[in-house]
């Protein structure tokens, strides 16, 4: 399941919206794909069961990438959000893997992955995602 070709093969096994997948913006970019185009392809087939909304900087697909703040990476998250709105996507958008911010560090809050943030970072991610949704809805 590590390539877009594998995703397409898997989703072609059973032609049903119940045969869907989690669309992860970051993983899609880590594979070297265009998250907006992949979102469009999956969404037009009603195959997105859940969205993981995160951003990355990729230096070498599959091998060398860094997770970054939602507003600071190579994924066109606003483009993805506009595509989800265009599709009238009705399910969950989860802004995952918050990055560490000062207030979390000062409180000693740590997460299970390198550079991961805590409560304030989660709030930042949710607020940023919600604002992006509102902006996409007004366009």
Could you tell me what each predicted segment is?
Residues 1-139:
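Histidine-acidic metal/acid-base catalytic patches
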